[in-house]
Amino acid sequence: DGFFKKFTQTITYAPNFISVVVISGMVIAFLSPSTGIINHLLSFFGMERISFLEDPRWFKTVYVLSGVWQGTGWGSVIYLAALSGVDTQLHEAATIDGATRLQRMWYINIPTIVPTMVILLIMNVGSIMATGYEKILLLQNPLNMESSNVIATFVYKQGLLEAQYSFAAAVGLFESVINAILLIIVNKISRKLGDTSLW
């Protein structure tokens, strides 16, 4: 039980402290059609090997799942910190009243950490278009270009490769404005529905 806990914590927290280059290298190694562990498992269960990074249909799934894995550690630390602020007397009183563990989680833990959840949601919505070009460029190849060419990579190529600095700056500014508008809208909705907001 202790080993499983440490193993889970390691694979959850470690990606948050590893560079994007290393994460991308691990993803490429895990998903390799010939030597990747994922395709070895597919072959073991009698399924056909999949070229995840060569097939445009799989690129978005790979990018999102690797991003979730990479960000889980940071989110876990934030939520654990929020849970540590839950009043233990509430749990003790609920236990005396006969509340089950699930009921204590639902009626004590979740309502207590709702403000933290709302703040994280607002911050994530504010950066919803900021995909980050580093990992996409590292995972990108000519075969998955139709799925992997996003605003961030477009700005990078136009600005640094094509030397169209003004155009790249305009596109980047447009992306920032959209993010700011979304942030303001979600913050206003949060302030109207509850007492939690960024400002």
Where are these regions (language model features)?
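A structural signal for multi-pass alpha-helical bundles of membrane permease subunits
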Residues: D1-W199
